[in-house]
From Swiss-Prot:
The keyword Cell wall biogenesis/degradation does not apply. The lineage of its organism: Bacteria, Bacillati, Bacillota, Clostridia, Eubacteriales. Shikimate binds at S20, L21, S22, T67, N92, D107, Y229. This is Shikimate dehydrogenase (NADP(+)). GO terms for biological process: amino acid biosynthetic process; aromatic amino acid family biosynthetic process; chorismate biosynthetic process; shikimate metabolic process. Pathway: Metabolic intermediate biosynthesis; chorismate biosynthesis; chorismate from D-erythrose 4-phosphate and phosphoenolpyruvate: step 4/7. The keyword Amino-acid biosynthesis applies. Keywords: Amino-acid biosynthesis, Aromatic amino acid biosynthesis, NADP, Oxidoreductase. Disulfide bonds: none annotated. CDD domains: NAD_bind_Shikimate_DH.
Length: 290
């Protein structure tokens, strides 16, 4: 569909964005849906962030996705937050409602929908590698599903402790914090029903890295999940598969988040299978350009 004066604007703000697949996924999906919209990648330097709300209103953007490092920093500039965004203290979708900017967070729901799509039961005890913003959203969602115990491992113990306290204060689940090291991971992984890598270790271009070793995973019966989707098969998941463990990559969560974004901004359900196909094909091209 040709661009014209009626073309509606959407986009992604963050820094850096050169490896993001969101513009490709959203633009092809919008075309598939027959909508006169365009989705732009907007690299914003930190000092320019306060100018974004007025730009959204002036240019009449329908909405934006928000990624690192602005998920928390954008909040003071918004007019309203969804319950999830307020609870998590982070926003990844902004909807422009006639100049009224409403912030949402779809991270946790995206992960839960991905689990359901794969038929994975998270069980009773979740172990998190990393205690940043992604871990916060996913942990809160799992607590809502009834996961009774959540353990957080991080190289920054104070960050893990803060997240554990946050979950304990807002749910009936028991949450604990530990300093990330081999012995603690091995001990906790033996009783975990699901282990989730919420760290960037293993993400493109450092695809040969894993937050833990094969020996660390030996003896665990947990489902392994990686929030990384580039590459589709992270080193962490490969090690688990070598030991016969069930695994789930971050593609489903990424696509579900994208679908939820379009539902929020457009009020329509997008073609989920098509969105996944677009991203998967692009990632496979990166692995094998021929």
């Amino acid at each position: 569909m040709p661009l014209d004066i009626k073309t509606e604007l959407m986009g992604l703000i963050g820094y850096p964005l050169q490896h993001s697949l969101s513009p490709l996924m959203h633009n092809l999906t919008l075309k598939k849906m027959g909508l006169n919209c365009i989705y732009l990648a907007l690299e914003i330097e930190e000092g320019k962030l306060p100018e974004i709300p007025s730009a959204i209103r002036t240019l009449n953007f329908r909405g934006l996705n928000v990624t690192i490092p602005y998920k928390e920093k954008i909040i003071p500039f918004l007019d309203e937050l969804s319950p999830e965004a307020a609870a998590f203290g982070a926003v990844n979708v902004i909807k422009n409602k006639n100049g009224h900017l409403h912030g949402y967070n779809t991270d946790g729901r995206g992960f839960v929908e991905a689990l359901r799509e794969e038929g994975i039961d998270p069980g009773e005890r979740a172990l998190f590698i990393g205690a940043g913003g992604a871990a916060r959203s996913v942990a809160f969602a799992l607590a809502g599903l009834g996961v009774s115990r959540l353990d957080f491992l991080d190289l920054d113990f104070s960050r893990a402790r803060q997240l554990a306290e946050f979950i304990t204060s807002r749910s009936s689940s028991l949450a604990s914090a530990f300093l990330m090291n081999t012995l603690e991971f091995q001990r906790l992984s033996r009783t975990a029903s699901i282990i989730i890598n919420c760290s960037p270790v293993g993400m493109f271009p450092d695809t040969g890295k894993s937050p833990v070793s094969k020996e660390d995973l030996r003896g665990s019966r947990a489902v392994l999940c990686d929030l990384i989707y580039n590459p589709l098969q992270s080193r962490f998941l490969s090690l688990g598969q070598e030991l016969g463990l069930e695994t789930m990559n971050g593609l489903g969560m990424f696509v579900q988040q994208g679908a939820l974004t379009l539902e929020i901004l457009l009020g329509q359900k997008p073609p989920l299978d098509y969105m996944k196909e677009v991203v998967q094909n692009q990632l496979e091209k990166r692995v094998d350009p021929d």
